[in-house]
Each structure stands twice: as structure tokens, then as C-alpha cells.
Amino acid sequence: MSEPRKILVTSALPYANGSIHLGHMLEYIQTDMWVRFQKMRGNQAVYVCADDAHGSAIMLRAEREGITSEQLIDAVRAEHMGDFADFLVDFDNYHSTHSEENRELSSAIYLKLRDAGHIDTRPVTQYFDPEKQMFLADRFIKGTCPKCGTADQYGDNCEACGATYAPTELKDPKSAISGATPVLKESLHYFFKLPDFEAMLKQWTRSGALQESVANKLAEWLDSGLQQWDISRDAPYFGFEIPDAPGKYFYVWLDAPIGYMASFKNLCARRPELDFDAFWGKDSSAELYHFIGKDIVNFHALFWPAMLEGAGYRKPTALNVHGYLTVNGQKMSKSRGTFVKARTYLDHLDPEYLRYYYASKLGRGVEDLDLNLEDFVQKVNSDLVGKVVNIASRCAGFIHKGNAGVLVGADPAPELLAAFREAAPGIAEAYEARDFNRAMREIMALADRANAWIAEQAPWALAKQEGQQDKVQAVCGLGINLFRQLVIFLKPVLPKLAAAAEAFLNVAPLTWADHRTLLANHQLNPFQPLMTRIEPAKVEAMIEASKEDLAAASQPAGNGELVKEPIAAEIDFDAFAAVDLRIALIEKCEFVEGADKLLRLSLDIGDAKRNVFSGIKSAYPDPSALEGRLTLYVANLAPRKMKFGVSEGMVLAAGPGGEEIYLLSPDSGAKPGQRVK
């Protein structure tokens, strides 16, 4: 028998500045299912996480609420832990990045990088708020767009016209925090020399540690050349001060991933069988997996392994990257009620409904997952209640009534039982590969076979016939054993259902190896309902409870878009005709390293190619979703040189900004290069 594997698993750290929602839960449920499977197999799997508790946003929110940053993060952490526990996410440790373990590790890793020559310093000029006495990130500066004149725009791009610019180009800049007019001020910043690790990263990203599509996207960034990474922020800042640099603090994204190590170190202090170096040492033979969303790949696949390499630690075995959650085919929306907080869901529905639905949809790729609420109700009611639980409810009564609750050991359908046992390796392989949807399909196919066989045997009819009682017990006994097999296969997904089934079956906690055995001459406990159907009214109530901003949406037309943004002054036809609008095909769309709001679009306009930067990242967090779409493009706008490259024109979008930006598309039949008239 092989030695148990040593596996350390993490999920991305939720930010300690807001509530957990169903999009977050996709990742934690996915990770929890995989870890539970590993533990059922007898492996030493350890699952750690923590709240990401540093940064200006936390400091400023705490200030607004009249509490300390520590009080804020403690309250949010307690809320997060309650949500996770009620969704049956079973962390071995849930810590905080604002911990002594993280302070010590962050400082030690930084000093190792510095002493090895991987840290650089240079002055950076930024806007400074003279009232708050703090430097301002781009998102904390607002002013008038230098291109279209729209007021109240952020410091790096205009949400009205899509233009991008440096904060210093804004007209009438103001601090979004205090309203004061900022001044330019120079400050010494600290940089991690990421280019030092380019060769290692090119090799590691192609080593099998990443899904192929993720590796391909990273190759584009690597081929375009890596830049040094700014790892410092100036006081005031809520975080850890950089050693030997008074008033300078680690940028939150430096100490956040180190929080994985800190949480594990905190656990090691309580569990002597765990050795920190055995999991994190340079020559560790343990496995290390990070489950993350595709929006933070660059931090985990470039900065993080480079930091670990430079500081003498091991690199991850693999990153397991997933897509985003949509609801009913659209982005989560507060106005539609589909931006559902974890607690709101829990107030209305059983967490195992969602755990199963996510499992039934999750593959090993990075595609987005859609929570279709009608399908959600139908699938849970059909699969879990109508198939799995139905087997036990059909059979248990006959065993209690006809044999005092004792399950006999007969096997009236050896081929069916063999099919269940033979399916186990394939289901295990699907779990291991994170092909949860394949595992669920195979399990439900077995449930269908079991139900069909029981219906064919019809124990309810046999029970009415003289001399058929032994057959009734044999049929129902096998039915309960098949139900037990299904519970074993579903236990990583449905731990609460499994615990209730174990109580009914009168057995110890089931392991994966138990699928090889049968219950025989075994006393069952009285059967209790294991799961109820989803009531559509409860789903509707959850959506209603999640709706926000409906009052604004229902205002009369006099308070509509034209009032918010009046029609501009008239122009003559010649002025309009001077703007050359073309149809463009988006061949490639990608993140811009170092830019909070920009996407880089490679456009085909018929006989030419164009490169455009557009401030639409907040509305399109998955850039690849735009690839292959047609859009409207201003072809004769003068090229604009930016720090990220040259933007050759502008794509057109509508909406007030933020998540509500809508890229314009032509009707079907339009072709790249055609002029809009």
C-alpha cells in the first residue's frame, strides 16, 4: 500500500472589507470538495486560508466607521468564518494576514530578497493629499477628463469616453478622500526585480503547474518583458512596515500570499505532527496547491513563485484556476437581485443545494460557471431528492416493517453491484482531476440504474404477495447498500447529507475504501427524511432580499439618463462626418500589467490591425470573453502614447461606469473595416 500523500491546499484570501457572496463561494466550495476527497482517501491533506487584512481601503473604511482597522478586520473575519462554516467549508485553519506569523515571514522573505540583490529603490512622483497627509492611488483621485470634459472621473481613465491618461493630465484634480486639491510630491519606492526570474518563470509556467490556457496567457506577458514590481506604500497605511525603512509599508499584494505560509505556521504550532519546513522547504516532497480565480493569475503565477524562489522556498505544485460566476447568464447584479451574499442565501436555502449544483457544473478548466436558477431548482430536486434520497426512502420502510430494521446480506443483482464497484476508480479519477461535473454525471448514472432496478423489482407489489417477503428484504437490502455506495461517492460534496445517512445506516464515518464492502445482517436506525425539495418561492424570496437600488431604477423618465448626462451642444453634419467610425473585430483582449482599469484590445479593421487601450476592465473581468466580438471603433483618432504603449484609437461603449459599461456591437452581418454611416 502506498504512503499517504502530504498535501497543503489553499484558497485565495478574501479581502477583509466586505461580505462573502456566491461568486466567492464557488472557489471555497470547489477547494473544500477536493480536500474532503483527499481526506476520505486517507491522504494527509491540510486546508488553510486567512482574511486578507491590509491596505488603504481597510484603513479608510475603519476611519469612516469610527473604529480601528484592527476592530474592523476582526469583525469581518468573524462574519467570514461564520459564512464559511455554515456552507460546510472545513478549513484546518483560518487565520489573518495581520498576524505575527505573517509579519515575521514577510520581513524575513523581504530581507532574503534584498540581501540577494532582488530589491531596487527609486523615486516616484505621485499626487499627495495635503489634508489627509497621504499619497493617493489613481482610484483616490477624481477630476475632469482631459479628452471629453466629463467631470468626476478617476485618475487613470474616463468612464464616459473610455480615454486613458496619467493622473497628472486630469483637469481640476481632487482627492476622492478629502476633496482637497492634491499636490505632486516625490517619494522613494521599493521594487521587486521580477525580471531577475524571467528564465525560471518561463520554465515553471510550462512545467505542468498550470492549465494550458493559463500558461498560454502568461507566455504573452513573459514574451512582452517583465517589469519591476512596486512593493511599497507610504504612511499612513494599514500593513507591515518594511524593515529598515521607516514610514514605508509592504504593498498588500506582497504580504497577502505569504499569508498562506503564515496560516500554516500558525496551525503547526497547534498540531505537532505538522512540520513547516516539510511543506515549504526548498526540497519539500509535499504537494502544494493554490485554488484561485483567473483575475489574480499574474500575482500567483509570476510574482509569488519568483518571491519563493528568491527567498529559498519551494514553488507551488500547481495552481488550480477557475472562472467567474454568472447568474442566469449575466454578471451578478444588485438591481436584479442576483448579487447574492452568502448569508442571504443561507437565510433561505440549504447550503448543500448550492454545493451540489456547483459540483455538477465545475470542470477542470477556467470557463465561467453560470448559476441558472431554474436549472438549479430542477437539478437539485431531480438528482438529489428524486434519485439519491429516493432510493433510501423507497426501501427503508420495508426493512423496518418486515425485518425489524435488520438489513439482510443478499445480493439479488450481482451485475448491478459490480457496476457500482467498477465505477469507483473513474469517479475517484474525476475528483482528483477536479472534473467534478464528470464525477456527478457518473454518480447520477448509477443512481438512475439503481432506481430503475428497484422499480423493476417493485418491492411494494411483492410485499402484497404471499411468500415473497424474503425477496422484498433482498431487494430493499441491496437498495440500501447501493444508496450507501452513492453516499460514499457524494460525501466530498454533501457532508451534511452523508452524516445524516451514516446515522440512519448506523455506521462510522464512511471512507472511500468503504465502497468495496457491503452491509449484511446489520441493524439500521429509523429512517428520517434526508433532504427536502427546493421550493421555487424560497429562491424568489432570496432574490427579492438581494435586490438593491430598485427605487432609483423605478423613477419616472424625468430622472432618467438625459437628466444625468444632458445631450451635448449641436454640431453640423460635417463635424460628425469627420469622425471615421469603423467595425472592428476584437482578435485578442488581455489585462494590462500594472493598470487597474485598462484592457488591451488587438483589433482587426479589415486590411489593418490596431492596438487600443480601453478603461472597461471593471465591466469585463474576463478579457477573453470579448475575443471574437465585433465592436465600433473610432479609426481616425490621433494615436496616444501612454506608459503601457500607444493607443491607436478608441472603442465605443455606453453606461455610467463601473460594472455598468456596455461595449457597443453592430447588428449581425457587419464586417471588419466597414464604415459606420
Swiss-Prot record:
Molecular functions (GO terms): ATP binding; metal ion binding; methionine-tRNA ligase activity; tRNA binding
Cofactor(s), by name: Zn(2+)
The superkingdom listed in its UniProt entry is Bacteria
GO cellular component, alphabetical, reads:
cytosol
Q: Where is this motif: 'KMSKS' region?
A: 331-335
| Alphabetically ordered keywords of this record | Aminoacyl-tRNA synthetase, ATP-binding, Cytoplasm, Ligase, Metal-binding, Nucleotide-binding, Protein biosynthesis, RNA-binding, tRNA-binding, Zinc
One Pfam assignment: tRNA-synt_1g
Q: Which residues bind ATP?
A: 334
Q: Provide the protein's localization.
A: Cytoplasm
Q: Which reaction does it catalyse?
A: tRNA(Met) + L-methionine + ATP = L-methionyl-tRNA(Met) + AMP + diphosphate
Coiled-coil features, chain-numbered ranges: none
Q: Which PROSITE patterns match?
A: AA_TRNA_LIGASE_I, TRBD
Cofactor note (record): Binds 1 zinc ion per subunit.
Where does this protein hold Zn(2+)?
Answer: 145, 148, 158, 161
Q: What is its EC number?
A: 6.1.1.10
What's an example Gene Ontology biological process for this entry? methionyl-tRNA aminoacylation
Location of motif 'HIGH' region in this chain is: 14-24
| The protein's assembly and partners | Homodimer.
Q: Which HAMAP family match?
A: Met_tRNA_synth_type1 (MF_00098)
Briefly state the protein's biological role. Answer: Is required not only for elongation of protein synthesis but also for the initiation of all mRNA translation through initiator tRNA(fMet) aminoacylation.
The similarity annotation says: Belongs to the class-I aminoacyl-tRNA synthetase family. MetG type 1 subfamily.
What protein is this chain from?
Methionine--tRNA ligase
Give the organism the record lists.
Pseudomonas aeruginosa (strain LESB58)
